[in-house]
Amino acid sequence: MAELHWPRIKQILDDGMERWKQANNRNPAMKVAHDGQIGWETKEELAESNPYGKQLIESDKVGNDRAEETNLIRILRGPIGGFRRMPSRGPYLAPNEISEIAQWINAGMPD
């Protein structure tokens, strides 16, 4: 499988948000809804996202086949620790899209 890079991951996340906006007929207010601690304009911003004190991509899980343990992948697949599956109320990312994000994290989050 070809190595995944940041532009593809950003596209997956942006497309998912666009589908959410269309389905829910409103803007998601990400900064308000997540205590101002989530974003993905850059891969660094995504890596540093820490909504409600939960690091989305813990650095010790990058590049070592532990992406499935990250809060990002866990919350995209289903609810965790009292937090509902994201994006809230769907539509959710497709399983193959989540798998691509996990592969990217496992590959060390290449640019």
Region spans (language model):
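Secondary-structure-rich domain cores
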Residues: R84, G108-M109
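Short, well-ordered beta-strand segments
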Residues: I12, A102-G108
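Short, solvent-exposed alpha-helical surface patches in well-structured domains
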Residues: N71, E100-Q103
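Solvent-exposed helix-loop boundary motif
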Residues: A2-Y92
